[in-house]
Amino acid sequence: MVLSQRQRDELNRAIADYLRSNGYEEAYSVFKKEAELDMNEELDKKYAGLLEKKWTSVIRLQKKVMELESKLNEAKEEINIGGPIGQKRDPKEWIPRPPEKYALSGHRSPVTRVIFHPVFSVIVSASEDATIKVWDHETGDFERTLKGHTDSVQDISFDHTGKLLASCSADMTIKLWDFQGFECIRTMHGHDHNVSSVAIMPNGDHIVSASRDKTIKMWEVATGYCVKTFTGHREWVRMVRPNQDGTLIASSSNDQTVRVWVVATKECKAELREHEHVVECISWAPESAHPTILEATGSETKKSGKPGPFLLSGSRDKTIKMWDVSIGMCLMTLVGHDNWVRGVLVHPGGKYIVSCADDKTLRIWDYKNKRCTKTLSAHEHFVTSLDFHKTAPYVVTGSVDQTVKVWECR
């Protein structure tokens, strides 16, 4: 590329300034003479530090070009996958693909939990800004804000009909919302510290909650009374989740364990210990995944009768573990995240595990082969939560960057 006379003159003056300001006096004198430069104070000011600025801006541009080339290659790959071959892909194998369909903004603090409505095309998000927001995931429209908590909302859960929403907060309360009228119909008090997790039981009659007070409590939906307290964890209980038929609940804790409890007797059926740090998240594997799990793990447990149940856990030790609850054994460990794992789910098709973490990624794991098949750079900050729609091809994520993102699967 040939420079114009003016550009050449500017470059020469910038080089001369660089040589002089860095003490290369002899080189400066020779260069000034050979380039026939007439340097003066006014011109000197204009070109001071110009060469360094140009150099750093070139490096910055090169980095940006590399990033854009990487994104372009990723987009080309996605287009190829989404072409005629991709269209033949079994819906059970659909996974989230970049870029996101929507990035929803509105929360003023980190998003702590995101969930899909079981019936309507609605997403609900909870945040440290003490609000719950409702969005339409098909249009990306914001619908409304539910206010009532006075501190960070930590978790939210629908009943199977989608008519009731439960929420819990660092304000030490659990609230029950009529999701048709968007009104708080009950507030439950009883925990002595931050309530970190809540879930409505499958029968819809009870709610379970977990707290920093080291307990798990069960509440009656009709009255708001606490009917059971499960004790055993030695530290903050981070998450609680019931299994599909509501006979068991699983909990994870800062004490680095996962516990499984029999609801009827409050007995701790299993204490699962292999994580080396706080266990942030848990989820039960649906029955649709059991055949793949048995094939993947070569598990010979329960040859007679139903296999499992199987449980997933994600930890600050950066790993995901799969457990056979019936024998209290870890079946596999998935390693790949570069920071705390904050969310983990089995894909509705049963073939994949989907996880999110503080490394800002969403990862899809082919657990049969124990490898990560896809990594999405999902957010600008820690990814705190994810949910997979049970029937429609969508995944939703929430982040410390205060956004909620909807991802289309194909």
Swiss-Prot record:
SMART domains, alphabetized: LisH, WD40
WD repeat placement: 106-145, 148-187, 190-229, 232-271, 274-333, 336-375, 378-410
Record has Signal as a keyword: no
An MF annotation (GO) of this entry: microtubule plus-end binding
PANTHER family: COATOMER, COATOMER SUBUNIT BETA
Subunit note: Can self-associate. Component of the cytosolic PAF-AH (I) heterotetrameric enzyme, which is composed of PAFAH1B1 (beta), PAFAH1B2 (alpha2) and PAFAH1B3 (alpha1) subunits. The catalytic activity of the enzyme resides in the alpha1 (PAFAH1B3) and alpha2 (PAFAH1B2) subunits, whereas the beta subunit (PAFAH1B1) has regulatory activity. Trimer formation is not essential for the catalytic activity. Interacts with dynein, dynactin, nde1 and ndel1.
Protein name per its UniProtKB record: Lissencephaly-1 homolog A
Species assigned in the record: Danio rerio (Zebrafish)
